[in-house]
Amino acid sequence: MRKQKIFFNSTLPRSGSTLLQNIMGQNPEFHVTPTSGLIDLMLGARIGYNQNHESKAGDTEMWKEGFYKFCKEGIKGYVSSQTTKPYYLDKNRVWAFYYNLLSNIVENPKVLYMVRDLPSIFASMEKKFRLNPDKDDGTMDNIKLKGTSTHKRVELWAQTHPIGYSLEKLQQTLLDGTAKNFLFIRYEDLCNNPENVMKSIYQYLEVDDFKHDFQHISQVTVENDAIHGIYGDHIIRNSLNMLPNDSRDVLGQYTVDSIKTSYKWYNDFFGYK
């Protein structure tokens, strides 16, 4: 069996990570995952490593080397237990934020990072909120006047998981330089120019190119969206196309302008106007 390679999909929320997984899944060389808990096994091992009193009393460098090799072999074993395919694309948005740790475990880790026009991300959240008036997920509190308007909900999401956390950590990767190791993919570019985007992905991964069918994308990842609450939506459309940007209609011009002002760094770096 050929040596297996693991790659990472660490995408912003509501930015097409599941779509990308299923496009990549057309390639018979690739095993693609739904939202994965593999990173939690690595981080769980790190908790044990840091809290272990015996390691602190012994040769700390030996324990450190052992921890990294433990994680490395554990990831290899995990991947080989899931598939015999040579390439494994694991999806979890926080991989990028642990790049320095990951790079001590996986040689030259390759991270695909999809981004999207920020008002569209927030609008996607708001639409999910409106679609579920029977559910109370804690977003809105009429007593405390929390989340009682679209603008307030956007402000709340900007300060909490998953959007606020992801944007804060993304900005940190740009600051500390780890982002230079990622391949950033704009969702809009994938929809409008998929052939070129996929070519750039294969070049970055150093894998042979593959001809994809963007009008017949089968759903190969399976996910229980109930686990993710009202915002869970991991069902893809089977043909790739760019839907009209409705963020102004959903959020209002004032909130769209506020998002763009607050995240100027994001728009400047990724070329959004």
What are these regions (language model features)?
Residues 91, 102-128:
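Conserved phosphate-donor/acceptor-positioning beta-strand/loop module used by diverse small-molecule
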Residues 16-30, 102-106, 184-209:
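PAPS/PAP-binding and catalytic site of the sulfotransferase fold
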Residues 10, 90-92, 115-116, 187:
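Short His-Asn-centered micro-motif
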